[in-house]
Amino acid sequence: MALQRLGYLGFDLKKTFIQKGAEFIFSQQQEDGSWLMPGKNQLVDEEKGYQMMPIQTAIPLLGLVMCGYGEDKRAEQAYKWLISKLLDDGAWPVDIASGNYGGIAGYRRLAHSRWGCRSNTTAVLTCLAYHPKRRISEEAKRALDLILGTDMKLRTNLGFLIARLIGLEKSIGRITYMAKFDIGHILNLCWRVEASVKDSRIAEFVEFIKSEQGPYGLWEYINHPQATRWLTFDLLRSLFKLETQEDWISLELRTPFRSYPKKIKRF
């Protein structure tokens, strides 16, 4: 998280303290490109028994790529490990336990994926979106297409990830690290992946954002108002960038989204 924060603030691999932090993280990397899961005593009940979680590698990789290490051969190895865990439908699973994919809680569902986890998929997509070349890869575009199917407009979550980056929100959780659906972050991903407001889902998110702008031109982060100027800068940048994007094709049909759909009973 420290490298993510420093990278967001504009520090890169030219700084000695960034180099030292990055080398320490790389020193913990496994031969296959991944990073180990925490010890069992650090896992919550929901995570015990898991053998692999994409987010275990996405979190350290994101800090590295935000500081300019995206094309480092060690980072590229981590990307290859993440791509190898990609599901056929373009999402990433929550985990593998005893050779089987883990179940998906409703708050982490993806509308058009059976085993895809929105938190894990968002984490990996964020890593791809900050990479100078992989950000417009088919894997990134497909993942964003799936995430856009989460049709939720939650005002209370708007700005959460920015507030976490600047230290106002706690950095906790593994499976839930990217579980909050923050439209501000989604728009940030959209322009980085070069999506377009011609997609009706993105257009609706943009309209929602504009409707929440305050009387003085600012977007307030409700939980911590001191993050307001940071959130405002981020949203203005995303809105400006999205106005120039046109080359985007969605492959997903638009369907109503429900976190916990009603199950059809047999009897």
What spans do the regions from the language model cover?
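Acidic carboxylate motifs that coordinate Ca2+ or other divalent cations, activating on Asp/Glu
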Residues: 32, 89, 216
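An alpha-helical repeat/solenoid feature that recognizes helix-turn-helix modules
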Residues: 1-20, 36-77, 87-142, 146-204, ...
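Buried hydrophobic core positions in alpha-solenoid tandem helical repeats
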Residues: 21-26, 82, 143, 147, ...
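Short acidic, low-complexity segments enriched in Ser/Thr/Gly/Pro
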Residues: 29-35
